[in-house]
Regions:
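C-terminal transmembrane helical hairpin of 12-TM major facilitator-type secondary transporters
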Residues: 287-325
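Helix-to-loop junctions at the C-terminal end of transmembrane segments
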Residues: 70-83, 169, 270-283
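Transmembrane alpha-helix termini and helix-breaking/packing motifs in multi-pass membrane transporters
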Residues: 36-46, 74-76, 159-178, 249, ...
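Helix-loop boundary and gating motifs at the non-cytosolic
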Residues: 3-65, 220-262
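C-terminal ends and interior cores of transmembrane alpha-helices
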Residues: 92-107, 293-306
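Substrate-agnostic recognition of the 12-TM MFS/MFS-like secondary transporter fold
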Residues: 21-31, 35, 60-71, 93, ...
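Symmetry-related core transmembrane helices of the 12-TM Major Facilitator Superfamily/SLC fold
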Residues: 176-194, 380-397
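Cytoplasmic membrane-interface "Motif A"-like loop-to-helix N-cap segments
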Residues: 79-91, 279-294
Length: 411
């Protein structure tokens, strides 16, 4: 697709940027509640560890199936309509889910598929619209500042929000906290009306045409390498869920979950600052080698399970994630500019999302089957293998930097 529409005035541009930034920050809080803490809540409404693992697997599987379906239905529609309404639809659906939790939170185990599917549809619509809106609303001159400020806000929330939400749930109830989150959802929808957008002229979406262009493009090997890396990365998605499950099985407390998450976020932010300040693309081989070793900490949980093992594993994986995620995100779209395919960015995003969707669904189906089997040894095996996927991604990035970036600053 081609972005034909530009904001006419700096005042309008500024208003849309601020509203989009606020909405995205509020999304971080809502997502934390509907992922980490909703998964923790399933623990409190489920009898038995095996049933808990099964229900989490069902929730995540239904969610990511719905994400894939909604994303691929909405991606072409986004190009044919005013995409801000798809964005607001995503926010409204998520608000409905939170309100659903307010009234039916204690019976969540009986309606787990509905909750997962509704969350997935909302997230799929959000993915299909947010990236397009951001690219359209934020001018090229403002993009770096927008991303930098957005990152600062997100990292700050990742430190403060978990321990606040966890504490509130423990001193009140999950449904009570859901009311507060519902208010945040309503505020988010109101703020979204400050974002101005319209359907660009001559905007198209043709996935088949993009794949045909890619076959003959000189940069195809670099782009395909990124796609292969995302196969391994897609399998790592399950790790965040498994970390939450481990903490709840070990501590059984939302406050503990929030405190551990906040501490890890704080440590991760410091590591990310050092990473950004002292490393450069093409000269990070040593760092990727060190980071590839960290997921081996999962072996402590597998063979020497204890409170300390869980905490060490959480810290190691937090450090690995905070370096891996932004690095891979940089390489995700950077090659398109070099290849002259940036007008096909939505089609490219669809390929990446399809790869990750398949890997995520496979991972959570395995988790569901493990829960049904009642064999916790298999849970530990899945924990170890999915954690080692981070090592595979880091090794792939190491090869990428050695092969393509050693003497070249472009990504």
């Amino acid at each position: 697709m081609t972005y034909q529409y530009n904001i006419a005035t700096s005042k309008k541009d500024s208003r849309s940027n601020v509203c989009l930034l606020v909405c995205h920050a509020l999304t971080d809080i809502i997502t934390l509640f509907l992922s980490t803490f909703l998964i923790a809540h399933i623990y409190s409404v489920t009898q038995g560890v095996s049933n808990y693992i099964f229900n989490v697997g069902v929730y995540e599987t239904s969610m990511y199936v719905a994400v894939a379906v909604a994303y691929f239905i909405m991606s072409p529609i986004v190009q044919k309509t005013n995409r801000i309404w798809i964005y607001r639809l995503a926010l409204a659906l998520r608000a409905i889910l939170v309100i659903f939790v307010v009234f039916f939170g204690e019976n969540l185990a009986d309606m787990i598929v509905f909750a997962g599917a509704l969350n997935g549809i909302s997230y799929g619509c959000y993915l299909a619209s947010y990236n397009v809106i951001r690219q359209e609303m934020v001018s090229r001159n403002s993009m770096n500042s927008f991303l930098a400020f957005s990152s600062i806000v997100s990292k700050t929330l990742s430190i403060v929000a978990p321990i606040v939400i966890g504490s509130l749930i423990d001193i009140s109830t999950f449904s009570q906290v859901a009311i507060y989150v519902a208010v945040i959802c309503i505020i988010q929808i109101i703020v979204s009306f400050g974002i101005s957008s319209k359907r660009p002229e001559n905007s198209t979406y043709n996935l088949k045409q993009y794949l045909n262009k890619l076959k003959t493009n000189p940069a195809k090997n670099k782009i395909k390498h990124v796609y292969l890396t995302y196969i391994a990365y897609g399998t790592t998605t399950i790790v965040g869920t498994l970390l939450t499950v481990c903490v709840m099985m070990e501590f059984g407390s939302n406050f503990s979950l929030g405190a551990i998450t906040s501490i890890i976020s704080a440590v991760s932010v410091v590591v990310l600052i050092l990473f950004s300040k002292f490393t450069k693309p093409g000269k990070r081989a040593w760092l990727f080698i060190v980071l590839a070793i960290l997921p081996l900490s999962s072996l402590l949980v597998v063979f020497l399970p204890s409170t300390y093992a869980v905490v060490i594993y959480q810290v190691c994986m937090g450090i690995a994630m905070i370096i891996l995620n932004p690095t891979l995100a940089t390489y995700r779209n950077g090659n398109l500019k070099e290849a002259g395919l940036y007008d096909c960015i939505d089609e490219h995003q669809s390929v990446v999302e399809l790869i990750m969707a398949v890997c995520r669904i496979v991972g959570f189906v395995l988790l569901m089957l493990i829960g049904a089997s009642g064999n916790l040894v298999l849970f530990k095996v899945l924990l170890g293998l999915s954690s080692l996927s981070y090592s595979a991604v880091l090794i792939s990035l190491l090869i990428y930097e050695k092969k393509y970036l050693a003497n070249n600053k472009t990504v």
